[in-house]
Amino acid sequence: MHNTFTHTKNNTHTKNNTQAKNSGSQTKSNAVSLNKPRKLTEADVTPESIFYQRRKVLQALGITAATLALPASAQADLLAWFKGNEPPKAPSGKPLTFTPSAAYHPDLALTPEDKVTGYNNFYEFGLDKADPAANAGTLKTEDWQIKIDGDVVKPMTLDMDYLMKCFPLEERIYRLRCVEAWSMVVPWIGFELGKLLKLAEPTSNARYVAFQTLYAPDQMPGQKNRFIGGGLDYPYVEGLRLDEAMHPLAFMVVGVYGKTLPPQNGAPLRLMTPWKYGFKSIKSIVHIRLTRDQPPTTWNLSAPNEYGFYANVNPHVDHPRWSQATERVIGSGGILDVKRQPTLLFNGYAEQVASLYRGLDLRKNF
C-alpha cells in the first residue's frame, strides 16, 4: 500500500489511500565519410508522410470536388486554416526569478528570441515553422496539472504553482539540434528532470520514463484534423531510459529568455534533452509514467526506419533522406543568410553523456 498525493494551487496536500539506466565508446564500425551534403529540398527535410499530407491538403483546396468530399467539419477546419482566420493571441510571458548557470555554455551566441519563438515544430498547431506561433494562442495553460504514476512509490498530481515553488529555477544555455539538420542556442529556464522524478520515488521495476503531451483537439487544431496535424496519431508521446532521465542534463523547462514559455514553445512545461534530436524534447507535458518496458514514441511509430527511440545527435549516422554531418544555424539573418557548421557527436555533450551508451551500437540504436 502507498499514498497518492495531490498538490493543488494553495499547496495543500490531499492524501488518499490507493494500490498502488569517463567517456563511453560506441561499437566500432566502418568509418563514415563526411562528404559535403547535397542541397536539401522541402521533401528532404520534411518527414515523408508529412510532405505528402501537405501536398494532399493543397491539392484538395485546389479541386472543388475533393474539398466537398471531405466531412463538413474537416472542410471548415481546412478553410479556416488557409484563409488566415486568426486564433486568439497568446498572452505575454511572465518574468521569472532564476539563477543563471555558469556551467552551461554562457559563452555561446544566443539565437535571437524572435527566431526561438517564431520558428518551431509543434504539429498540434500546424506543419509550417510559423504555424505554432500563429495558432498556439488557443492553448489554455491555466490550472495545468502533471500526473506522475506507474512504477513509483508515491504517485502524484502536481500543479504548476507547486512546481515553480518546489524547485529553484536556473537558466541553462543549451544547444538545440533538430533532426531536420538545423540548430539554435537557447537560454532555457527550469529544473532537472531527475529532481522531479525523485519526488515520486521510482521503484526497482522502473527502467523507462514515458511522457505524454496534452490531448485537447478543441485547443490544438492538428489533433482535431489529421491534415493539419500531419497524419500523426495523438496525443504525442515520448520516452527515455530511466538513467537518461536522471542525468543532470535532462531539464524540465518552464521558461525561455527570462519569461514563462510561450505556447508555441511548449508551455507551460516541456522537456529538454540537449544531446538528442529536438523531437525527443516533448512539449506541453501532462503525464509522466515510469515503466518497466520501453514506451512507444510518436515519431518512431510513424516512421520507424527514420526515427529511432534513442535519437542521439550523431553526425556519423545519416537520416535515410539527408546527411546529419552538418547543420544550418538559425541566426539573425534571413533565408539567404545561411550558415552551416559541423554537427558534434551528442550535440557537443559527449563528455557528459557518452558513458550512458557504452557498448551500445549507435548505428543500430539510432
Swiss-Prot record:
The lineage's top-level taxon is Bacteria
Give me the ranges of the annotated region Disordered.
1-40
Q: Where in the sequence is the signal peptide annotated?
A: 1-76
Name the positions where Mo-molybdopterin binds: N120, Y123, E124, C178, T213, N265, R270, S281, I282, K283
GO terms assigned for molecular function = metal ion binding; molybdopterin cofactor binding; oxidoreductase activity, acting on a sulfur group of donors, quinone or similar compound as acceptor
Q: What does the PTM comment of the record read?
A: Predicted to be exported by the Tat system. The position of the signal peptide cleavage has not been experimentally proven.
Question: What is the name of this protein?
Answer: Protein-methionine-sulfoxide reductase catalytic subunit MsrP
Q: Which Pfam families match?
A: Oxidored_molyb
Q: Looking at the UniProt record for this protein, which Gene Ontology cellular component terms does it annotate, in alphabetical order?
A: periplasmic space
Q: Which cofactor is essential here?
A: Mo-molybdopterin
Q: Where is the composition biased (Polar residues)?
A: 23-33
Recorded family membership: Belongs to the MsrP family.
Assembly with partners or alone:
Heterodimer of a catalytic subunit (MsrP) and a heme-binding subunit (MsrQ).
Q: Which CDD domains is this protein grouped with? A: YedY_like_Moco
Q: Which GO terms describe its biological process?
A: protein repair
Bound cofactor: record note: Binds 1 Mo-molybdopterin (Mo-MPT) cofactor per subunit.
Q: Gene name on record?
A: msrP
What residue spans carry the Low complexity bias annotation? 1-22
HAMAP family (alphabetical): MsrP
Q: Which organism is it from?
A: Yersinia pestis
Q: Where in the cell is it found?
A: Periplasm
Return the EC number.
Answer: 1.8.5.-
